[in-house]
Design a protein with these regions (language model features):
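Generic detection of long, well-ordered alpha-helical segments
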Residues: 1-4, 105, 155, 159, ...
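A cross-family signal for N-terminal binding/gating loops and helix N-caps
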Residues: 1-126, 131
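Basic, nucleic-acid-binding surfaces and adjacent catalytic neighborhoods in DNA/RNA-processing proteins
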Residues: 22-41, 54, 88, 164-225
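Short clusters of hydrophobic/aromatic residues that line enzyme substrate/ligand-binding pockets
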Residues: 45, 148-151, 203, 212
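Phosphate/anion-contacting hairpin/loop surfaces
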Residues: 70-187, 193-194, 198-200
């Protein structure tokens, strides 16, 4: 499953080709993703301009000019395949974070949602296992959305510190590695980076969370960041 750094790379690639541009057309080829694609998906996004492509934890967050927000998750196997009029060569594709050049014929049967953006760019959401999702909300309800409201602090945020981490670990009875995977403790950390962070901080993955205080918490917060 893509973790926070990989999702951030995808976000940057999408921002490069989508921000400030109009959604000309959308093809929803399958509605039955992990959460069904809303029936009014096309109606709400077609003709709208993407103002900002953001991220919250492992979710991509697209903010549109009318206040609509697109929430997307890559699941286990999801990819955003970017096709611009001139990116089918290795040289031009290297300008987009993530190197999104591809042969579209290899992925067509798994491309469930396709965005046609102004200037001829096409973004294809490919997800063979269909554990990903795309759904809609709006600015007023974003923070309280069921997929967002439980999330802990961003590990790259200035408010994520050792004392904050230590406080959020209190009361956890699972080993520290499992606690780090709890998105309510810190958002976006997955299996790979939990292991790496614990190793960098010199902590056993079996340690009890309540013992991660003081300098231990400071080291772990720094490693997670």
């Amino acid at each position: 499953m893509p973790e926070l750094p990989e999702v951030e790379t995808v976000r940057r690639g999408l921002a490069e080709v989508m921000e400030g541009r109009r959604i000309e057309r959308i093809e929803v080829r399958r509605h039955d993703l992990r959460i069904p694609v809303p029936d009014d998906f096309n109606e709400r996004l077609q003709g709208r301009t993407l103002e900002k492509m953001g991220r919250r934890a492992k979710y991509l967050v697209g903010e549109f000019d009318d206040g609509t927000i697109l929430l997307a998750h890559l699941g286990m196997s999801g990819r955003m395949i970017i096709e611009t009029p001139d990116n089918m060569t290795e040289k031009s594709a290297s300008n987009i974070p993530g190197d999104f050049a591809h042969d579209p014929g290899n992925h067509a049967k798994h491309e469930h949602i396709v965005f046609h953006v102004g200037n001829g760019t096409v973004i294809r959401f490919s997800d063979p296992r269909r554990f990903g999702l795309m759904t809609l909300t709006d600015r007023e309800n974003f923070a309280d959305h069921k997929l967002i409201r439980h999330l802990g602090p961003e590990p790259t945020g200035e408010d994520f510190t050792g004392p904050v981490l230590a406080a959020r670990l209190q009361g956890k009875r699972t080993p520290i590695k499992a606690a780090l995977l709890d998105q309510r403790v810190v958002a976006g950390v997955g299996n790979i980076y939990a292991c790496e962070a614990l190793f960098a901080a010199g902590l056993s993955p079996l340690r009890q969370p309540a013992t991660v205080q003081g300098r231990r918490a400071d080291r772990l917060a720094m490693a997670v960041r």
